[in-house]
Amino acid sequence: MKTSVLLLPKTKRILETVGYQIKLARLRRNISSQLLADRAGISRATVWQIEKGESSVSIGAYLKCLECLGMAESFLNTAKDDPVGRMYQDAGLKNAKKGYK
């Protein structure tokens, strides 16, 4: 039996939002959950879990649904802007420069 990853409440809400957005995209295209499942090569139950934002579903299944809906490219924006990482990177570069004096 698969187990769900324990997520913080904020992270769980993000995953639920992604699932809801996938469901809206499917409904806007007038595609049944069974048809999406068939196209994605997953079960209808997995589509239902994705649309509920379940953390036990693989990221590959989420991406396959996005691909079937013509939205896989939107996944490329994930972590594209990383202000915190940039801050750490800049701080590290400043420290490295000080070491060379």
Q: For each predicted feature, which ranges?
A:
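A short, Lys/Arg-rich alpha-helix, primarily the initiator
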Residues: T3-R28
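Short basic helix-loop element that most often maps to the first helix and adjoining turn
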Residues: Y20-L35, A96-K101
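Alpha-helical residues within the helix-turn-helix
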Residues: L27, D38, E67
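Short alpha-helical DNA-recognition segment
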Residues: N30-W48
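Short, basic-rich loop-to-helix N-cap that marks the start of a DNA-contacting helix
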Residues: E54-L66
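Short, charged recognition helix plus adjacent turn
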Residues: L76-K101
